[in-house]
């Protein structure tokens, strides 16, 4: 019925339970009553307080389910929606006079009211509490900083006999310190003061206009237009490098940083564009290929490959010998050693994400990555630093996948089929009807299935070894692992062994193992 009528479960429940509002439905009322208990007030007595009670009741339900689904507070996408809901709930808690951490107490009520229908809430209770409490603590710190500044402003106003806080100060509190304007307004009202609303609106409009003009100026100076826009928009480069590292193609265009040219001689730094290439262009965190381009009259060293406009691949190159020209046939050769080193790190990044999700939980999602020939850097959603034990477990699991010599399969398929297989997609990424899926392992031994357009090895055993070199914070709710594979692990071990040996010699110890005694 609720689906056909579009009335929603809560509205249907309010009819069945013969109550006036969804906030009087049994499961919602229990949360509302808990909010009132924490705030020390009664619902239905004061309009402004009732609004705050309803906001907290609604938002704590939403963010509890969002956290259960693996979403973390952030500054973009769903994470941003979650952050705004969380902070709005905390802010209304302040308006009700709640000063300490209180969201974690309400989570218990939300879970108790919904665990029969959604048993994953109870399973993830501790995790949900950690996520919400961390964000609440961070926002409280923001509020505390803003309160100190606002208290100083109020004291100065009282000293000067003023009753209105100027719009510029209100805007600075909001824009620079993240202190909500409605909380500023509420605190001023308690002191018998007001906020210069018109002045605040003017500052806000001025900032928007400044940002708009800055963008327009940037566009006017040509930063949004490059030499590559001068090339026919229908021209594109076909990538043939998934299964080959060499290929022949015609040089279609040669450019400098700012103009199209017909030829280039030894010593020139140029961009070479062709209709086909085995060179992978930087994308998805995987760096562009390097190598050589050779014609009958010249040789170029490719130092980078980038996707430019409308599907065109630009080979950044230095002409080392002779001369090259538009229209010449050329032989393109990717540097094999570098490509395979990059593929080791990229394939291992997939195994790393799979291991992180097993050790830390399914809330872990890729938030960014960089894979080059020397290392892999993987950013992921997680709310606090990994323990030493967790890092060891992740390392052990990744190396287990490597030693199991799992086959790596790459295939294109309809997106619906990929989703049925449970392939991991990058949050916020837009995909077409057909996607490329990378699968590591088979059947019960499948370690990873991900959407990915990058290049990979054919078997996990070719990664060799995996070792985490560091784990750190990038932003609130985002952690970063830097790691090495293959020969990089040996180099890291040798470097650390040398450091330990030096420490032992400094302490005049014959055996480095005696350092820990």
Give, region by region, the residue ranges found by the protein language model.
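A glycine- and charged-residue-rich anion-binding loop/surface
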Residues: 3-517
């Amino acid at each position: 019925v609720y689906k056909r009528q579009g009335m929603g479960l809560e509205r249907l429940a309010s009819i069945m339970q013969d109550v006036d509002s969804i906030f009087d439905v049994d499961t919602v009322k229990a949360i509302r009553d808990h909010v009132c208990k924490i705030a020390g007030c009664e619902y239905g007595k004061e309009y402004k307080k009732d609004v705050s009670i309803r906001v907290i009741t609604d938002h704590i339900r939403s963010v509890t389910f969002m956290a259960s689904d693996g979403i973390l507070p952030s500054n973009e996408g769903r994470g941003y929606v979650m952050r705004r809901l969380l902070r709005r709930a905390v802010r209304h808690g302040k308006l009700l006079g709640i000063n300490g951490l209180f969201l974690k107490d309400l989570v218990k009520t939300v879970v108790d009211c919904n665990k029969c229908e959604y048993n994953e809430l109870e399973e993830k209770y501790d995790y949900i509490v950690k996520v919400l409490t961390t964000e609440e603590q961070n926002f409280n710190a923001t509020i505390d900083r803003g309160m100190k500044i606002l208290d100083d402003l109020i004291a100065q106003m009282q000293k000067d006999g003023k009753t209105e806080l100027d719009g510029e100060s209100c805007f600075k509190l909001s824009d620079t310190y993240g202190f909500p304007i409605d909380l500023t307004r509420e605190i001023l009202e308690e002191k018998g003061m007001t906020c210069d609303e018109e002045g605040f609106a003017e500052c806000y409009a001025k900032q928007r206009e400044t940002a708009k003009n800055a963008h327009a100026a940037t566009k006017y100076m040509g930063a949004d237009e490059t030499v590559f826009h001068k090339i026919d928009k229908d021209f594109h480069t076909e990538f043939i490098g998934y299964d080959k590292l060499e290929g022949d193609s015609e040089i279609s265009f040669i450019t400098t940083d700012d103009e199209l040219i017909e030829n280039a001689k030894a010593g020139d730094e140029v961009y070479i564009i062709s209709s086909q290439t085995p060179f992978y262009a930087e994308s998805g965190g995987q760096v562009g290929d390097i190598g050589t381009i050779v014609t009958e009259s010249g040789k170029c060293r490719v130092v980078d490959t980038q996707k430019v406009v409308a599907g065109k691949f630009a080979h950044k190159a230095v002409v080392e010998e002779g001369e090259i020209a538009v229209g010449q046939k050329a032989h393109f050769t990717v540097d094999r050693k570098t490509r395979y080193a990059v593929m080791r790190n990229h394939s291992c990044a997939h195994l790393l994400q799979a291991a992180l999700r097993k050790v830390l939980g399914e809330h872990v999602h890729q938030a960014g990555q960089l894979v080059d020939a020397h290392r892999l850097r993987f950013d992921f959603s997680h709310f606090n630093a990994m323990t030493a034990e967790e890092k060891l477990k992740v390392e052990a699991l990744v190396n287990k996948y490597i030693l199991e010599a799992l086959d790596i399969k790459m295939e294109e398929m309809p997106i619906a089929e990929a989703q049925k297989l449970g392939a991991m997609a990058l949050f916020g990424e837009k995909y077409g009807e057909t996607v490329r899926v990378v699968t590591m392992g088979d059947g019960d031994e499948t370690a990873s299935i991900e959407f990915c357009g990058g290049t990979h090895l054919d078997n996990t055993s070719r990664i060799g070894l995996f070792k985490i070199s560091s784990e750190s914070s990038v932003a609130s709710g985002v952690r970063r692992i830097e790691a090495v594979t293959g020969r990089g692990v040996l180099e890291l071990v040798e470097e650390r062994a040398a450091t330990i040996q030096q420490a032992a010699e400094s302490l005049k110890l014959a055996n480095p193992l005696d350092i820990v005694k």
